[in-house]
């Protein structure tokens, strides 16, 4: 009996430590950006400044204006959220985590019209950047990144 009690305590403590382990909370930033070559009208936001060089190389534009954004802290990896601006909105539905990336269902709307619906993987190591439609003399750019 004396041997069984320590063994039972050891088994239960291992079971609780394994079962009670949870994923660390992480915040995802989502941004709707208008990229243009017009003169700057306002300073570039900090989130955009982090990847401004990449955006310039990818799209060839020199100015980036943040028109909508959202931050969501992921606790289970299966949350959803909305980043919106006056005319565009991005609905993000996180479907869980696989191999150091979040699996996302993305829907981009212009007012009520669905423009894009896709599945994507958001790596924890690098941002997800999507070229959107032409807007005036610029381009809509969608950025999601784990902070």
Residue ranges of predicted features:
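Positively charged n-region of N-terminal signal peptides that target proteins for export
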Residues: 1-4
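Bacterial N-terminal signal peptides
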Residues: 6-17
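Outer membrane pore-forming secretion/assembly proteins and partners of Gram-negative envelopes
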Residues: 21-147
